[in-house]
Amino acid sequence: MTDNAPITFDGKRFAAHLSTAPGVYRMYAADDTLLYVGKAGALRKRVASYFNGTPKNTRLTAMLAQVVRMDVTITRNEAEALLLENQLIKSLTPRYNVLLRDDKSYPYVLLTREAWPRIALHRGPQIVPGRYFGPYPGMTAVRDMLNLIHKLFKLRSCEDSVFRNRSRPCLQYQIGRCSAPCVNVVTHDNYTEAVHRVTLFLEGKSDLLAEELIQAMQVASEHLEFEQAARLRDLLTSLRSMQNRQYVDGRAADLDVLACAALSGHACVLLLSFRDGRNLGTRMFFPKTNGEERTAEILSAFVSQYYAEYPPPPEILLDQEIPDHTLLEAAFSRSSAHKISLRWNVRGERAGYVELAVRNAQVALSTELTSQRAQRVRSEAVRQLLGLEGPIKRVECFDISHTMGEATVASCVVFDAVGPVRSQYRRYNITGITPGDDYAAMRQAIERRFRRAVEEDKQGERPDVLFIDGGAGQLAQAKMALNAVGVESVLLVGVSKGEERRAGHETLIMLDGQELHPGAASPALQFIQQVRDEAHRFAITGHRARRQKTRMTSKLEDIPGIGSRRRANLLKHFGGLAGVKAAGQTEIARVEGISTALAAKIYASLHGLSKNDAANASRVS
């Protein structure tokens, strides 16, 4: 249902024609920008409340002044409206909603499902067969967990392509963090037992694991296997030491603790997670707010958005009562396998957890505001150094990374006045240039970035300053790229490495040839260094990933008759390109979809042989 009034919007009239059913409403500005998404138990009553009387605050006044149309979606119940509201807020990011800003998916511990399971950190879609434990509140918690598992249980962490082609144990075995299943140092039965123990450990069943270790230790002693008994004893001692450090609740609770702090128009929500009584650590969120929301409203928005994406534990402790808590409990319980309880005003040990979360939220917010103030000072110093008229709202920096021209990747990082905007980072895989031609790579990356902005008319995504990691030559290429797509209003600055590549001695190069030497103590240069270093980091990580993928697949892709499916079958069968290269023609021909003739072609291509040489080799293999 839509009212298409071109200039003014009659909210009362629109509301009068709405249903009393539950649903979701959306408010739009004249340029079709989505201003706000909300849910309602009764659409008519909720929408009418915006237009009856004076708005409660300046934020609401400013928003309603921009509304030119609304539309609604009716749902079967209010819980369904809540879920739809969360989906729309996350996907459409309305200007006036409290937005949970988190650019990264949560980390999990992955235990793969194969003959010799691998354990590893995992982020992103869960497409690898195996069991996923988590999510954990942060990377530190996962790395600490994996560190402990490798030390105690010695499971492998290597990729299959490495595992299947080892001829001797790797360094992880030498330092006591892997049992070397790749070369059968450990028996399959013993490795499977270690996997079982890791599973108990990750499930939080440490008491059960301890009982099993005690029984196994007794059996080993009875059979006079004293070395095995000693290893089990040491494992049990380490496990108990870990329990004493990490367990804070003997009743082994699964719960999250949330607290919200707000100051000077900014907010921090702190999440403290416990699983099976074990403290998994904290994670801080800094939601985008409009400065006038109460902490209870911010916390309510966070809870609804966060747990719409991640499974909630049975118990969630809050530092205060939040709006719609009953509705949230019902919606979460309906989508979970257990009842979800939101609690505040708790006592005893749980009150201590809440107090700890509140204190940490306040400290985190104070630290963040201090960091933002310092960043604004540096940003202002850049403005003054470069002679810009207005404040800097957005800067970008490009960098190129490759290895002798292989797998060239360009990065583009984005900063605003208070720090990095990671959700807008971009990488560009460079193709169609002479390998190692950094000038052509830079020109291609900048053209691709700005051509899209021009085509989509995204003026707000154009930077005030575009930093180029390089000297006058790179700067000239960047200018050519901008001219090619018709962009003229962007200030270009080259960042040339200093004498002996020492930090603090960088030279800033302008298009007119002017050189600036701010010096190591300059706040402006500190800001520029941060941006440049981030561009370099982002480029090199992208390059390494592309190089690894290229080395795994490109040689096979160049062979006529090898498509994506056959290539995948080969890599899966042999565990990687090295395994394919080590195989004989007869072995290659056993792979699904590979004929004898194609196997000969593959063997010849990978070994640089002629057809006759390949035929002779086939008789040998």
Curated annotation (Swiss-Prot):
Residue ranges annotated for the GIY-YIG domain, each copy included: 20-98
DNA damage found in the keyword field: yes
GO annotations of cellular component type: cytoplasm; excinuclease repair complex
Domain UVR, chain residue ranges per copy: 207-242
UniProt xrefs under InterPro entries: GIY-YIG_endonuc, GIY-YIG_endonuc_sf, GIY-YIG_UvrC_Cho, Hlx-hairpin-Hlx_DNA-bd_motif, RuvA_2-like, UVR_dom, UVR_dom_sf, UvrABC_protein_C
Record's subunit section: Interacts with UvrB in an incision complex.
Record's function text: The UvrABC repair system catalyzes the recognition and processing of DNA lesions. UvrC both incises the 5' and 3' sides of the lesion. The N-terminal half is responsible for the 3' incision and the C-terminal half is responsible for the 5' incision.
Protein name as catalogued: UvrABC system protein C
Annotated source species: Xylella fastidiosa (strain Temecula1 / ATCC 700964)
